[in-house]
Structure formats: structure tokens, C-alpha cells
Regions:
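Beta1-alpha1 glycine-rich phosphate/pyrophosphate-binding loop at the start
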Residues: 6-11, 15-99, 207-208, 271-277
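Short hydrophobic core segments
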Residues: 11, 130-143, 180-183, 326, ...
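C-terminal active-site-capping segments
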Residues: 397, 401-483
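Alpha/beta-hydrolase fold catalytic core
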Residues: 267, 272-328, 332-335
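Glycine/threonine-rich phosphate-binding loop and adjacent beta-strand/alpha-helix elements that clamp
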Residues: 51, 338, 342-410
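Rossmann-like dinucleotide-binding core of oxidoreductases
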Residues: 2-5, 9-10, 15, 19-20, ...
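Short beta-strand to alpha-helix junction loop
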Residues: 70-88, 100, 183, 253-262, ...
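Feature captures the FAD/FMN-dependent oxidoreductase FAD-binding
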Residues: 73-144, 320
Length: 483
């Protein structure tokens, strides 16, 4: 089998993989690397999801790259605009020729004899080959791109209309004048409902339980003022700092004073929807704020749709699908031409690759994460896992920066291997992510764990991580250099 040698192998050409490539171009210009992408186009999430209204659920000042300002006045950005931003970034940093599309890594094995990762690569066209890489950065995201999560609905096949899955949206679906049911209460559902309601005959948002929803302007007035008086980069940096601090504050207060934030969010919803709307049934969850991710709606678009005659919300369980729609547990029959099961993601670690160390399969659930990016006792591997309580890209950027610093440190020491060493798994660990979202709870058995103390604790706090990752010392008693 033909073999290629690289310094760095990046797996995944989405937001994280592109960002890692840009960091290498800027900070390690002599490094040989390739970005392998299994799909036919780059962009990851922002190319895969094409449902109506697809947009960011974080502001683009923190969701955009630190090194490349987001210049659109809309800081809650439509998906196509984000995809354009990614493609422009690829061209600006000369990554187009380094990205190999329709090229899947199926197996990844660390060879201690060679001090290299050996990746088995399957291009859609051409022969299978191997890549021997000094360092691997997994930027595959956290969910299965081929299959979303779909509960077993009784009578699912009885429905005679169209079932449109958000993860695989039918390109030719015309929903104008149609009756639509959107099942779900998360970010996807609250995005789809107001968009489809613009032209559909009626949209019903059917949720098993409510989520916290936070309305904010689609255009940041503070950033808008800064852009008028400052150069783009300064306006971007200051807006970014403001939003980072604001998100950390909101999350911190939500954890310390959940009742205060709950009352605040309830008041905002009541102010938007009016006293006659049953906010407590539909927008007042039983869990605390930020125990699950807060759903962002720009300019109150979901509330506006619900106040119109084109959309309504039902909080109930699905009993079964029928030929003409579905029936809820309370007995309500809801007719529809189209049903959209916005029921969540299916977690997948490492893009489904079979990972092994010296031919011994790696079960990451029995390992801790080091600084939220490396895996205990696994050499020369970084896994980009962004924030779930803030913008994903903030952590992806820190990870990319750290990988570059770590490679430079290895060069200075004249070594080929670096491993975060752990003698034994501690008796007490934490979940990698603090959120209690269903898709994360379902996947707890397949994710690495967080320790209780640094550097094994996954802080999920940008300021703490920045100090640790960007400015922390390598000689911390954990990282072992050798080879």
C-alpha cells in the first residue's frame, strides 16, 4: 500500500479543521500537512445543514475566527453566509490545495516503533493508501454526519405526507401553503419554525418539554458603532472581548443564581408574547438555565411567529404518527402535510474512525482529557472539541494555537513524541461537558472524562482556558516529551 509522510494530519474540513490549517500556515510555515474531508464539500456543519433558516446560534464575533474579522453587520449569521466566510478563509490562507475532499480516514493507529500515526485513507475515487503523520488533529466535530437522532415513533411509516429531516433536508421541498409540524424544542426547531411560518399555511411546534429561549437583536448596536469609528480589526476585537465577557457572566450567574436568570428569561418571554400567552407551559423548563444550551432567537422571530396566526406551540408527547399527521398523548390530533423531526443529534467521537495505539483499540471513555484537547496516555493527538456553553470556535482557536506551540516545543527539544501521562484513572471524574442535554447524556459512555483538577479538568471557561492553554507552561508534571 502506498504511503505518504506528513508532519500533521488534520481530519475534517469544517470550522475547526480550516482554523487549524490557518494556524499552521501562519505560525509554522514549513510544516507539511493535509486536511482530509470525507464529504464532497468543505464547511462541515455549514454545508451539511440546509434546512430553512439555518443560522448561527452564537454571535459571529466569537464564532468567527480570531485572526479573520467577521465583517457582515449581521452578527447572528445565516448558514450560507458562514459557508461563504469559510470558503473565503480557505482561499485567503491558501488551503484549497491542502484539502482533500471525499477522502475518509477509517483507521488510525499509533506505531511506537515508528513514532508516527498511521492513517488508512479511503478516497472515493482511487486506491486506498496510508499517511504516516507525526501529529494528528481530529477536527471531525461531535456528531454523526450521516444519521441524526430519531426516536422510535409508533406509526412512523403510516404518515402519508413528507417527513423532512433537518440533517438531510430535501432540496426540492416546497412548503408554501402547507401544514407543518416541527417536533422539537432545541436550536434547530426554534430556527425552522419562524422561517417556515413565513410561507407555510401553518406551523405547529410540538415539544415534549420546553427550552429556555433568549431573544436578542440580530445586529449588535455596540459593534455597529465601533465599526463606524474604528478600523475593522479593532472593532472586531473589542466586540469579541465584550461578547466573551458577557457570555461568561451570563453562564456564571445562571449557575450561581438560576432562579434569578429563570425569572429574567420568563419576563422577557412574557413581555414579547403578552399576558395571555401561557409562558409557564411552553417556555419555563423544569431544569435550571444553562443546564442545557440556551436557545438564541434573533429579534424575537419565534415569538413573532407564535403571535401571528401562522404558528402555534403544543407542549405534549407524541403518542403516534397517523396517516394525516400525529396524535399526542393527551389525544390531540394534529394534521400536517410535512413533519420535521428536529429531535437532535447522534454523538460520534472522532468521526467514526477506529483508533488504536500499537494495534490496541482505544476506548476514550476510559481516559481523561488533558487541557480539554488531548487524551491521557495517547501520544501526539489533539481532539478539537469546542465549547457548548459559548461559541465553539473560541475553544477550537485555543486548541489550534496550542498544537502549533506544542509542535514548536517538540522541535526545540529535539523529540518526536509528547504524551499527557496519567498513572491511573481517578475514583471521581466528571462528564466532559457540563450540560444535561439529551444528546450528550445518551453519549456519556463514548466520551472521555474530565478530571476534578487541572490540567485534567475541562473548564469550559474561555478565560481560564486561555491562561492555561495559550500561556501555560509545558513542564507541568504531566506532559512527557521523548522519542
Amino acid at each position: 500500500m502506498q504511503r505518504e509522510n506528513l508532519d500533521v494530519l488534520i481530519i475534517g474540513a469544517g470550522l475547526s479543521g480550516i482554523g487549524q490549517g490557518c494556524h499552521l500556515v501562519q505560525k509554522r510555515p514549513g510544516t507539511t500537512f493535509a486536511i482530509l474531508e470525507a464529504r464532497e464539500r468543505l464547511g462541515g456543519t455549514w454545508d451539511l445543514f440546509r434546512y430553512p433558516g439555518i443560522r448561527s446560534d452564537s454571535d459571529m464575533f466569537t464564532f468567527g475566527y480570531r485572526f479573520r474579522p467577521w465583517k457582515s453587520p449581521k452578527d447572528i449569521a445565516p448558514g450560507p453566509d458562514i459557508l461563504t466566510y469559510l470558503n473565503e478563509t480557505v482561499d485567503e490562507y491558501g488551503l484549497r490545495d491542502r484539502i482533500r475532499l471525499q477522502t475518509r480516514v477509517t483507521d488510525l493507529n499509533w506505531s511506537s516503533a515508528e513514532n508516527r500515526w498511521i492513517a488508512t485513507v479511503h478516497p472515493d475515487k482511487g486506491d486506498t493508501y496510508e499517511i504516516a503523520a507525526r501529529f494528528v488533529v481530529s477536527c471531525t466535530g461531535y456528531y454523526n454526519y450521516d444519521h441524526g437522532y430519531l426516536p422510535e415513533f409508533e406509526g412512523y411509516d403510516d404518515f402519508k405526507g413528507v417527513i423532512a429531516h433537518p440533517q438531510h433536508w430535501p432540496e426540492d421541498l416546497d412548503y408554501a401553503g402547507k401544514r407543518v409540524i416541527v417536533i422539537g424544542s432545541g436550536a434547530t426547531a426554534v430556527t425552522i419554525v419562524p422561517t417556515m411560518a413565513e410561507t407555510a399555511a401553518h406551523v405547529t411546534m410540538l415539544q415534549r418539554s420546553p427550552s429556555y429561549v433568549f431573544s436578542r437583536p440580530g445586529v449588535d448596536k455596540f459593534a455597529d458603532i465601533l465599526r463606524r469609528v474604528l478600523p475593522w480589526r479593532w472593532a472586531y476585537k473589542l466586540s469579541r472581548v465584550k461578547n466573551v465577557l458577557l457570555s461568561i457572566y451570563l453562564y456564571s450567574v445562571s449557575q450561581r443564581k438560576p432562579d434569578k436568570i429563570r425569572a429574567y428569561l420568563r419576563k422577557l418571554a412574557k413581555d414579547e408574547l403578552g399576558e395571555d400567552f401561557d409562558v409557564d407551559t411552553h417556555f419555563n423548563p423544569t431544569y435550571g438555565p444553562w443546564d442545557q444550551r440556551l436557545c438564541l432567537i434573533p429579534d424575537g422571530d419565534l415569538y413573532k411567529a407564535l403571535k401571528s396566526d401562522r404558528a402555534d406551540i403544543v407542549t405534549d408527547h407524541v403518542e403516534r404518527f397517523t396517516t394525516t399527521g400525529l396524535r399526542t398523548k393527551s389525544g390531540q390530533e394534529i394534521d400536517a402535510d410535512i413533519i420535521v423531526p428536529a429531535t437532535g443529534l447522534q454523538i460520534q467521537f472522532g468521526g467514526g474512525m477506529a483508533v488504536s495505539v500499537d494495534n490496541q483499540p482505544l476506548d476514550v471513555a476510559n481516559h481523561l482529557v488533558y487541557r480539554g484537547m488531548m487524551v491521557s496516555n495517547v501520544p501526539n493527538l489533539a481532539v478539537t472539541f469546542g465549547y457548548t456553553n459559548a461559541s465553539w470556535t473560541l475553544k477550537a482557536d485555543l486548541t489550534a494555537d496550542y498544537v502549533c506551540r506544542l509542535l514548536t516545543q517538540m522541535d526545540k527539544r529535539g523529540v518526536e513524541v509528547v504524551t499527557p501521562k496519567l498513572d491511573a484513572m481517578p475514583d471521581k471524574t466528571q462528564a466532559l461537558v457540563g450540560l444535561q442535554s439529551g444528546y450528550l447524556l445518551r453519549a456519556s459512555h463514548m466520551l472521555p472524562k474530565s478530571g476534578l483538577e487541572s490540567p485534567w479538568k475541562n473548564h469550559e471557561n474561555y478565560i481560564s482556558d486561555m491562561m492555561s492553554i495559550r500561556y501555560g507552561k509545558f513542564d507541568d508534571g504531566v506532559l512527557a516529551f521523548g522519542g
